[in-house]
Amino acid sequence: MEPSKLFTISDNATFAPGPVNNAADKKTFRTCFRILVLSVQAVTLILVIVTLGELVRMINDQGLSNQLSSITDKIRESATMIASAVGVMNQVIHGVTVSLPLQIEGNQNQLLSTLATICTSKKQISNCSTNIPLVNDLRFINGINKFIIEDYANHDFSIGHPLNMPSFIPTATSPNGCTRIPSFSLGKTHWCYTHNVINANCKDHTSSNQYVSMGILVQTASGYPMFKTLKIQYLSDGLNRKSCSIATVPDGCAMYCYVSTQLETDDYAGSSPPTQKLTLLFYNDTVTERTISPSGLEGNWATLVPGVGSGIYFENKLIFPAYGGVLPNSTLGVKLAREFFRPVNPYNPCSGPQQDLDQRALRSYFPSYLSNRRVQSAFLVCAWNQILVTNCELVVPSNNQTLMGAEGRVLLINNRLLYYQRSTSWWPYELLYEISFTFTNSGQSSVNMSWIPIYSFTRPGSGKCSGENVCPIACVSGVYLDPWPLTPYSHQSGINRNFYFTGALLNSSTTRVNPTLYVSALNNLKVLAPYGTQGLSASYTTTTCFQDTGDASVYCVYIMELASNIVGEFQILPVLTRLTIT
């Protein structure tokens, strides 16, 4: 290798051009300097980055703060507007649900009061079409068809002694006469009543007439009410009207009957339903009667029977209870084929395989006594504004919600609809439902039924369907004993036990004897007040309660069919009592 031109090598190991220590020191210094410069630059860069980041953050925070401030302001504005709107809505809701109804009711009462004042008859001048207006005493108007108890608290009851008043129900006048099947409806302005007057003992398939009356509630000098009869119609035209239901309507009464001169069993055995009659009786003595053919009747029903219990005037419609025999192979019969309702008393259940009990419950709708027809409940619904020109419709509830069809009553209390169904089949307890209708201008209307579980007492029944039986079986038994609810029923858990109702029961499990006034809760009787002597025979009972808003007294009229040893088999008696609630 060629020697370096920069160095002179000798044995003394010396270098040219200068000393080795100076060069090394300079190199070390340069390295340190460079490291220092790079470090300073790095630190500076980091500081710049941090500073820029902080500036960006501050800028962003300021913008976000401004945005949040703007949003907060808008939320506050919206909250103010919502609060204002809610305040207005609360005023509207209170006005519509509380103030307006009270004002309307007050105006109505004022109008009725004015009518009662100006509608008088003097010796020379009469300013009315009739001497007495068809308007109840103002003390009672506001206490009719209202729940007597609005809370769900525990209460005690006392049924007073029967009050002495003139009976508004005439009796038979011969030993072989018979008055039966009372139907009573109390409206805000007046009441309507009807019963059947049978010419040959109590065989209603032969020949009978129909007694109809209307009147008002007035206060007697004794302080308690009296049912003052203002109009009477006695329908004696050769038609054998049966099982009539009555309803109060504007200025009069509406009555739904069917006409038949054969046995009930023969009606069910046939295939063509008997004549259906709708009769309108007004305070001006006008009587209009129509033969109706409700939609869904022909081809589906072997027979259709009014429910006996009263109907209602509701939302410009006339609604009556009905029941009858559905032809199994008809359109309606096929639709209902597999439907059944089997209530259970948890305190006294029926034992056995569930599937077997369900099958027996289904078969109970087809009693052989009534030619194996499906015995079905229904409602006759008629549009009031076209009552003279259009037919009515039959609205049929699902049998998944109701027991076998039977006599019944439709109640309207505090604008809530309830339906009593006679316990004609195997179930021995009172049957009461809350109901709601869905009406349509075209097509089929519908009804929903919600059973109210009552287990406090049973009706008398015969054979295997006595009051002690709680298991499904096909039978036709029982008796009509409608209740009057004193409180609204609530589905809220824990308060249902304080649902109270009153009526007249027959205190026997097998025989129609021992009429007894009662007040009951769902599961137990609160008060029992026997009427008459032990063993007294009785039959149908219907009950209506109302309040004297002048002194807050509560009255109930229990209309009962009682045995008579003097005139006829039964005498229909209205028993008026004061009900004390504490």
From Swiss-Prot:
Side Virion surface, residues: 56-582
GO molecular function annotation: exo-alpha-sialidase activity; host cell surface receptor binding
GO CC annotations on file: host cell plasma membrane; membrane; viral envelope; virion membrane
GO biological process: symbiont entry into host cell; virion attachment to host cell
CDD domains per record: HN
Site, Binding to the glycan motifs of the host receptor: residue positions: 180, 242, 264, 323, 369, 407, 422
Site (Binding to the host receptor) location in chain: 512
Positions of transmembrane segments: 35-55
Residues on Intravirion side: 1-34
Location of this chain's protein in the cell: Virion membrane; Host cell membrane
Top EC category: hydrolase
Region (Involved in neuraminidase activity): 240-245
Keywords on record: Disulfide bond, Glycoprotein, Hemagglutinin, Host cell membrane, Host membrane, Host-virus interaction, Hydrolase, Membrane, Signal-anchor, Transmembrane, Transmembrane helix, Viral attachment to host cell, Viral envelope protein, Virion, Virus entry into host cell
SUPFAM superfamilies in the record: Sialidases
Main location: virion
The keyword Endoplasmic reticulum is assigned to this record: no
Site description Binding to the glycan motifs of the glycan motifs of the host receptor, residues in chain: 540
Superkingdom to which the source organism belongs: Viruses
Catalytic activity as recorded in UniProt: Hydrolysis of alpha-(2->3)-, alpha-(2->6)-, alpha-(2->8)- glycosidic linkages of terminal sialic acid residues in oligosaccharides, glycoproteins, glycolipids, colominic acid and synthetic substrates
Function: Attaches the virus to alpha-2,3-linked sialic acid-containing cell receptors and thereby initiating infection. Binding of HN protein to the receptor induces a conformational change that allows the F protein to trigger virion/cell membranes fusion. Binds to the glycan motifs sialyl Lewis (SLe) and GM2 ganglioside (GM2-glycan).
Entry remark concerning the domains of this protein: The C-terminus (head domain) is involved in binding the cellular receptor.
Family, per entry: Belongs to the paramyxoviruses hemagglutinin-neuraminidase family.
Quaternary data: Homotetramer; composed of disulfide-linked homodimers. Interacts with F protein trimer.
Protein name per the record: Hemagglutinin-neuraminidase
